[in-house]
Amino acid sequence: MIFRRRGSGKSKKIVVSPNSNNKNYKPIKSNDSVSRDSKKPLPAHKWDGKTINNLMVVGYYTINTPYEQEAKKLISSLDKFNITHDVIGIPNKGGWQANTRYKATFMLEMLDKHKDHNLLYVDCDAVFHTYPTLFRNYECDVAVRWQDFRWRQNECLSGTIFMANNQKTRSLCRRWESLNKKTQSNKANLEQWNLGEIIKDHEKTNGLISKNLPAEYTFIFDLMRQIYPNAIPVIEHFQASRKNKRRV
């Protein structure tokens, strides 16, 4: 079954510091299995044709902006692999920062909308190259990619987010939403930094179980190709904000 919702009208629906004590933190070595420096497809890339019935891929884009075209590419890639999804269009919130900070509210809404599904959020400028089999019988509350870059260590990347549908993730989203609002005047602050902060806090205070996604599931098309030259991406992100954030 393919789930897509389309509509009309006004709203169409179709600095984290390095912390080696954080259990999410894992330095990447060239021979580390996390880096996947292999020319052969990983087991996670092999698809037996069976879909994951309780997984819903969700995402959003701003209507009448270049992101609408990006979303069409995402939806096409989801349809190719018969991946159940709900990708919607929203009105422009007033700028790139406001639009990205909406992610916390969106995830909370999707958890309520799809109560029988775990969620896999992806930014609308991403595409799926194969079926995300990693999430079959995936056991955790939340998973994101924690990535070491030259300019920032252990950065939480929110382009791909797995969330189990439970009260812990609802609580996480509410705290994330609240922190986004508190920091909205700080234009240098990113929503994914806020998410990383809340994940760390909820691991300590709320028993949240998190995982570090493989690089192939949050694969930034150029930056991560430099880090993992032989990786075979499952979900590839094309960073449309680099050219669009000043226009939207």
Question: Language-model segments: what does each one mean?
Answer:
Residues 2-3, 12-117, 167, 236-244:
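N-terminal anchoring/stem segment of glycosyltransferases
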Residues 92-93, 126-127, 149-150, 167-168, ...:
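Short, solvent-exposed loop/turn segments at secondary-structure junctions
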Residues 49-52, 137, 152-156, 226-231:
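Extracellular/periplasmic catalytic domains that process cell-envelope and extracellular macromolecules
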Residues 105, 170-248:
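Catalytic core and acceptor-binding pocket of nucleotide-sugar-dependent glycosyltransferases
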Residues 101-156, 160-166, 170:
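GT-A fold catalytic core of metal-dependent nucleotide-sugar glycosyltransferases
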